[in-house]
């Protein structure tokens, strides 16, 4: 199973969170997808994928991310979400 880790703890502002997410295995190490790019990738994903989301004290970015993921999950049942609660 492929895995993507979206670490919101390291992002300082909501703008950062909307621009920089984790990368999928096989992508270059410096690749950071924007939210809309991530949406397109996940909608087309055809293998099981585990998505780990690490959040901190700022839940604004988390809320926007979860809205997008819930929307994608309605069209792609290969996605498994694991939310890791971490208070920075």
Task: Give the ranges of each region predicted by the language model.
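Walker A/P-loop-proximal flanking segment of P-loop NTPase domains
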Residues: 1, 24, 40-44
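Short glycine-/polar-rich loops that comprise or flank the Walker A/P-loop
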Residues: 2-3, 77-80
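A short hydrophobic beta-strand->loop->alpha-helix junction that borders the nucleotide-binding pocket
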Residues: 3-12, 85-87
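Conserved NTP-binding/hydrolysis module of P-loop NTPases
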Residues: 4, 12-30
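A Trp-anchored, charged/polar loop motif used as the substrate-binding/catalytic surface
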Residues: 27-40
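Conserved P-loop NTPase "ATPase switch" module shared by AAA+ and STAND
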Residues: 38-65, 69, 73, 81-86
């Amino acid at each position: 199973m492929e895995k993507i880790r979206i670490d919101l703890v390291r992002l300082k502002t909501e703008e950062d969170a909307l621009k920089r997410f984790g990368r999928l295995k096989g992508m270059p190490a410096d690749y950071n997808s924007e939210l809309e790019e991530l949406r397109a990738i996940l909608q087309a994903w055809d293998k099981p994928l585990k998505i780990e989301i690490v959040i901190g004290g700022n839940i604004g970015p988390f809320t926007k991310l979860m809205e997008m993921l819930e929307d994608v999950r309605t069209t792609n049942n290969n996605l498994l979400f694991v939310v890791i609660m971490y208070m920075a």
